[in-house]
Amino acid sequence: MAPQAPDREKALELALAQIEKSHGKGSVMRLGDEVRAPISVIPTGSIALDVALGIGGLPRGRVIEIYGPESSGKTTVALHAVANAQAAGGIAAFIDAEHALDPDYAKKLGVDTDSLLVSQPDTGEQALEIADMLIRSGALDILVIDSVAALVPRAEIEGEMGDSHVGLQARLMSQALRKITGALSNSGTTAIFINQLREKIGVMFGSPETTTGGKALKFYASVRMDVRRIETLKDGTDAVGNRTRVKIVKNKVSPPFKQAEFDILYGKGISKEGSLIDMGVEHGFIRKSGSWFTYEGEQLGQGKENARKFLLENGDVANEIEKKIKEKLNIGAVVTADDVLPAPVDF
């Protein structure tokens, strides 16, 4: 027979007191004890993607996975997040396992390359050990690992070319994520893992595509983004950029499976102004009549390219449109380096 209610409450209070004595105050708490503020975020640089994420950007204190085919815009999205974190006064680190980071391109996207911490590790173990130490310092706001596929275990590097190393990388990723997830939550650091696609052999039904590094990252990631290039943007006959679609495949902080489309211009990155025009038209703030775009009676230009240039030259108008869109959709928490909210980690 179950003990009476008062006895159960007393037993629970004793247990909680014992836990606090052993493990410190706050080891166990009731979820309703504290008023939870909105999860603070790092904007992605595209308002369409911020809206698709549901909270106005990438959540702090979480693991994010960005994957997709080659040259789809994965690193560009990550670098824009780095630039936005730095603009808010944050500290960023980039672990360049592929040894392919272009500082000039990063600078064009708004990244402060002088203060960006960069590591080009020799092995996967070294890369993840550096990541763990940086996260545990508590000083980092955003960390990018580019890419999971390039995190080669030491045994594979030191072995012969034809040797079999089944599951080594998956075990390495699983161990690393077990270690860093709690530290991310405590420090409020956002960790972005960029990943590549592979094809499973012999798949008859469903998609044969899969990501590298085993299944651990799929479980630990709070947000997974599938980035695809869907169209080439042209100025006459010259290719000037790509139309990109991002699908939020997994989202623990908002409803998943939303999609966002935006332009990535060669040498310039995500077109914030182009994204504002798309969202402004969709939500009725910008009026499109034929090829003309109008905002509150003021003509932005004929054709999207001219409207984009107008917003680029008139930042106050662009900021006003962005503010109205965010207010209508009720997204976007204030982000400052001094006011980081540790996000709870759920598995």
Swiss-Prot record:
Record GO biological process: DNA recombination; DNA repair; SOS response
GO-annotated molecular function: ATP binding; ATP hydrolysis activity; ATP-dependent DNA damage sensor activity; damaged DNA binding; single-stranded DNA binding
Coiled-coil stretches noted in the UniProt entry, renumbered to this chain: none
GO cellular component: cytosol
Xref: InterPro entries: AAA+_ATPase, DNA_recomb/repair_RecA, DNA_recomb/repair_RecA_CS, P-loop_NTPase, RecA-like_C, RecA-like_N, RecA_ATP-bd, RecA_C_sf
Binding site for ATP: 68-75
Pfam families found in the cross-reference section: RecA, RecA_C
Bilayer-spanning residue ranges: none
PROSITE patterns membership: RECA_1, RECA_2, RECA_3
Keyword tags: ATP-binding, Cytoplasm, DNA damage, DNA recombination, DNA repair, DNA-binding, Nucleotide-binding, SOS response
Major place of residence: cytoplasm
Signal peptide: none
Compartments where located: Cytoplasm
Top-level taxon in the UniProt lineage: Bacteria
HAMAP family: RecA
Record-stated family: Belongs to the RecA family.
Role noted for this protein: Can catalyze the hydrolysis of ATP in the presence of single-stranded DNA, the ATP-dependent uptake of single-stranded DNA by duplex DNA, and the ATP-dependent hybridization of homologous single-stranded DNAs. It interacts with LexA causing its activation and leading to its autocatalytic cleavage.
Name of the protein this chain belongs to: Protein RecA
